[in-house]
Each structure stands twice: as structure tokens, then as C-alpha cells.
Amino acid sequence: MEIHPSARKHGIADEDIEHATEHAMAIEGQDDDTRLYLGPSRRADLLEVVTIVRDGGSELAIHAMRMRTKYQRLLPGG
């Protein structure tokens, strides 16, 4: 996964972005070729990561931050 500089805006490390997507607890596909991943950082803080799905299936992370409560409902048991 490639990480766009905009995904670092909130100070989330690249390794945590990758960890959250690789260990996602919820993945929501959007109508505009983006995906929302909700998953843990390496320290178990829940993150929200948005990626753009490219032709060929590769993804570009464009947003990452601590998960907002509005996404709690998407998690198992949420």
C-alpha cells in the first residue's frame, strides 16, 4: 500500500496505517472507489484509514486518524 502525504496530516505513522488496514475490524466500500478501514494501530488505538482503490487493485491511503465515535456502529458489537 502506498501512503499519500495527506494521510500523515494527523501524525499517524506509516507503520500504524499499514497495521490498521492489515488487521481491520471493519471495512466499508464506498461508491467512489474508496474504502474505509477501522483497525488498531500497533499500540491498539483504533484508527480510521481511507484508501483509494486504483485500477489493478492497489490502494493509496489518503486519510488516517484516531477513529471517531461515529464509526463505532460499524465495528462488531458496535
Regions found by a protein language model. Name each.
Residues 1-78:
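Ribonuclease/tRNase effector modules and their secretory precursors
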